[in-house]
Amino acid sequence: MEEKKKYRFADEKEQLKRVNSFLATGYTIFYIVILSVSWESYFRGVRTLGYTGLLSVLTLIAMAINFLSTRKDKSQSRSRKIAFICFVVIAFLMAYAYDSYYVRFIAAIPFCGYVLLYDKKNVAVTGGIYFALNVFVNIIRIGVQHAYPKEVAIDHIYATFAIGLLIVLIYAITSVAEQFKRDTE
């Protein structure tokens, strides 16, 4: 008689646990980068202690919420939603306060993990929200505050366009992964 192999990730609940753990790691990396960037900018005199402290407290709270919600039940989609809300708040504060493009692109780390969910709608919604956040920041910084000279403003617009393309690419990869999963079931 042939022995059946047991595959740990054949169970969808086990898959969700692994994906949520992967996403939590991605968010943690994002938050660590945010903390290091904000403190480094404080020590260079670019940001005040008040802003850096506030951002640090919010980032540490987001990290704790992310950790606790993922630890409580790793298979819940609720923990992903909570983590994303915290992410959006921190990403907005960083996109608004910092001109560096890498700060906006580092946010792609958690989005890469969404491919493992095989959920195009999730990628479209969360990616759309993140893209809209970047457009909103550009409207405020370029259109309302006139914070940049023309050349720099154009660079920010192209960076936002590139973020949109990256999200579209992640969506396309998720779509293909979803098709592969369906075809192999």
Descriptions of predicted regions:
Residues 179-185:
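Polar/charged heptad-repeat coiled-coil helices used as signal-transmission/dimerization stalks
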Residues 103-104, 125:
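Alpha-helix N-cap/helix-start motif
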Residues 22-99, 106-113, 130:
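Hydrophobic transmembrane alpha-helices and their membrane-interface boundaries in multi-pass
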Residues 96-102, 118-121:
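Transmembrane helix interruption/hinge and helix-loop junction motifs
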Residues 13-23, 48, 73-80, 119-123, ...:
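Membrane-interface helix-boundary signature
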Residues 36-57, 116-179:
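Alpha-helical transmembrane segments and their interfaces in multipass membrane proteins
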Residues 1-16:
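Short, Lys/Arg-rich, polar N-terminal cytosolic tail immediately upstream
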